Amino acid sequence: MADGDGLGEAAIAAASPASAPGLSPSLGWRERLRAGLAGTGASLWFVAGLGLLYALRVPLRLCENLAAVTVFLNSLTPKFYVALTGTSSLISGLIFIFEWWYFHKHGTSFIEQVSVSHLRPLMGGTESSISEPGSPSNNRESETSRQNLSECKVWRNPLNLFRGAEYRRYTWVTGKEPLTYYDMNLSAQDHQTFFTCDTDFLRPSDTVMQKAWRERNPPARIKAAYQALELNNDCATAYVLLAEEEATTIVDAERLFKQALKAGETIYRRSQQCQHQSPQHEAQLRRDTNVLVYIKRRLAMCARKLGRIREAVKIMRDLMKEFPPLTMLNIHENLLESLLELQAYADVQAVLAKYDDISLPKSAAICYTAALLKTRTVSDKFSPETASRRGLSTAEINAVEAIHRAVEFNPHVPKYLLEMKSLILPPEHILKRGDSEAIAYAFFHLQHWKRIEGALHLLQCTWEGTFRMIPYPLEKGHLFYPYPSCTETADRELLPSFHHVSVYPKKEIPFFIHFTAGLCSSTAMIAFLTHQFPEIMGVFAKAVSMISRTCIEYL
């Protein structure tokens, strides 16, 4: 990766400087005094302990006691040392195994957590600096925590697959469940939000469907949908449920969605005529609007999967024009993917110009599509050797900066695009900047990167240069907010257990794991040497005890 490193440095030099961080407020004399005392406290305690030990050496008869201990150690046989070191090795090995398991499960050291949470307060440990309520540091921490909460919000995957026609077929073939209970529970909550309202009791079919969306068992949901159709043959949400969960092919799903569209349009027109009569009628209109938009969007996705891409693009454009307030559904991401399949790069740029705005939420689809378009202009002629000799051109610098911007937003995507990590079926919900979003993006967009000659090669040479600009991503970002620390936990809930969740930044192994591993290895080695060479190890043990006694007598 030497070429990639050089290109990354060139891009960083060409990039505009980041904004200077704000100046921290000066500490008062009390805070400075407290910090100084905290730094020298440990040294003072150590010196005081040595002085106390020296003063009490005669009353405590340290020399006589040490001589007695030496006689006792000299009387021990080599078998005792073998048993002692073997037991120590076993105990330290068990501690090491437990520490390693706890670190992989919770991402932190158990011994460090217990020390900080329980032992430190007992020993009188305090924070080096305490923020007063309303202080600038406290305000910054509150702002950061609020940003982390918004960044860790779970979003519905705009390109989510069909349960019956895709997820279930995967289960039939592999025997693995691609969706987690947490993910499906979020979908159930979405369905209740989109497809129900307070006036459902007025229509028996809607009452049945309200129970169906809350049902956990798929066969029970399908049975309830058929019951709703028996009560009302124009129940659009019943057709939606059957298309999502019972249809085993995209063709069957499209047929059911077309029936849902016919029923949904009729109900929507009826709700439009009555919307001003009461607040209940307005709630019905919002619900019927959600149902209609959902049906049309899924029909567009069916057309995209069946190869009728221009038809899918038309449906999506009409949806975005007819229902502009529903931008939170991220229909533009469906449109971007379809336009990339058509290789209509000018239209893709036009969509990005509207949605890649500083005031709008970002996504991996937005950032990486922008990087792909800039990469497309230089990737076919790009050569690392040539760029190292003559430097990067303006277009190449723009492409590298776009890649760095995308990687900073979601650092998990490149490994999937470069096929360094295997893909799985994307979940129904994603966490922005997390591994789940990276899987969802790469699952649909990998083919678009492969289609452009040299795009993946340029990505491979430059993407790791991003990490030099953000050495501490959890504390400070470059173009975005600091990377949220909650992504790993949320992604583990969203992604199936057979997938190895990508973690960023990579966690360092705690000190106590190294310590217990070294302790286990050293005691095992001592036990082995004592068993094989008892006389030599006995002489070594006596020498160590004599040296220790001499040092104490000297004190």
From Swiss-Prot:
TM region(s), chain numbering: 36-56, 80-100
Disulfide bond annotation, renumbered to this chain: none
Places the protein is found: Membrane
Main subcellular localisation: membrane
Membrane topology, as annotated: Multi-pass membrane protein
CC annotations in GO: membrane
Stretches the record annotates as Disordered: 126-148
Cleavable signal peptide: none
Keyword line: Membrane, Transmembrane, Transmembrane helix
Family: Belongs to the ST7 family.
UniProt name for this protein: Suppressor of tumorigenicity 7 protein-like
Higher taxonomy: Eukaryota, Metazoa, Chordata, Craniata, Vertebrata
